[in-house]
């Protein structure tokens, strides 16, 4: 449990929508997502959805722990303040908060993220052990929990966070060894399928949100990308790395209950500035959060080119090769 209280003192906000649903994906490379230019047709729902697509969004780090702690928490210099996170910010602003996770709560690398999750008013972790166990745990198991969250305390404005297993290696565990598109390497074929499964999951999230009859906004991003091992061979697979752009290039989009057309934000956006993006999404202002640039637009914002490597160093994303 996080013992230090948050320092947030935001304006009270009811946001523009009744229910805000933040879906945190796992290990999805942007170039494997059809809606973001991937060549494999694996996102039929998102392809036709009137979403705001961010096609130059980069993750904060190359792994779940590095990425999400630096995405979801306030940073002062090189110091992370886990108590000052998106959940506690939303709570202080008047939202009822939920954290529903299909990732672990007890593994070494899970712990900082689960601490953030446990700061919600309601939290539930489907996997009681570590996220790195090799057991099948479909993300669809989160849907009944989401249904409960949406329909409990209907008078409350809510932030509901869904943390997926998504495309976490090994991908064939995620898909139960099934795939539709055979690219000659089984793990890569499963990886393509795992992204299609996330697309199907997201369509069901939207369906549940619609069933409430209330307004909603859904934001999705993947925590990080992956890199190739044995590329272009039958034994090719994708795993964590920090040496290429593809380790950080991830899908990010927002869709609302009143969205009518697809929009594209081409300007670079970094997850290191996610606290600003998040606060603007929920219509929250706080003196501790920079707000000079409109992240939810095509405004040219500065310093959107940095990421963190495995050693905790800040590096320039554009200096990395693309492989």
Locations of regions flagged by a protein language model:
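A long, amphipathic alpha-helix that forms part
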Residues: 2-11, 144-151, 179-221, 253
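Active-site rim elements
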Residues: 73-76, 186-195, 206-207, 237-241, ...
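Extracytoplasmic/periplasmic, Sec-exported soluble proteins
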Residues: 38, 78-82, 134, 138, ...
């Amino acid at each position: 449990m996080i013992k230090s209280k948050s320092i947030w003192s935001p304006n009270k906000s009811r946001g523009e929508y009744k229910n805000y649903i933040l879906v945190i994906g796992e290990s999805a490379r942007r170039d494997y997502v059809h809606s973001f230019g991937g060549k494999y047709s694996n996102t039929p729902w998102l392809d036709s959805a009137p979403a705001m697509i961010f096609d130059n969004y980069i993750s904060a780090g190359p792994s779940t722990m590095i990425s999400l702690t630096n995405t979801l928490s306030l940073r002062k210099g090189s110091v992370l303040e886990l108590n000052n996170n998106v959940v506690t910010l939303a709570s202080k602003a008047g939202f009822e908060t939920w954290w529903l996770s299909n990732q672990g709560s007890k593994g070494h690398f899970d712990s900082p993220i689960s601490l953030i999750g446990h700061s919600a008013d309601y939290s539930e972790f489907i996997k009681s052990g570590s996220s790195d166990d090799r057991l099948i745990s479909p993300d669809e198991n989160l849907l009944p929990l989401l249904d409960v969250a949406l329909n409990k305390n209907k008078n409350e404005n809510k932030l509901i966070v869904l943390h997926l297993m998504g495309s976490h290696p090994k991908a064939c565990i995620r898909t139960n060894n099934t795939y539709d598109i055979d690219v000659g390497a089984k793990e890569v074929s499963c990886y393509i399928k795992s992204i299609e499964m996330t697309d199907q999951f997201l369509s069901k999230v939207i369906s549940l949100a619609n069933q409430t009859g209330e307004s909603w906004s859904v934001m999705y991003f993947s925590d990080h990308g992956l890199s190739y091992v044995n590329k272009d061979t039958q034994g090719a697979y994708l795993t964590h790395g920090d040496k290429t752009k593809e380790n950080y290039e991830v899908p990010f989009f927002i869709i609302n209950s009143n969205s009518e057309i697809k929009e594209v934000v081409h300007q670079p956006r970094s997850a290191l500035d996610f606290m600003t993006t998040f606060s603007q999404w929920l219509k929250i202002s706080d003196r501790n959060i920079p707000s000079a640039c409109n992240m939810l637009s095509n405004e040219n914002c500065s310093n959107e080119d940095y990421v963190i490597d495995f050693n905790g160093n800040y590096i320039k994303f554009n200096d990395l090769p693309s492989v």
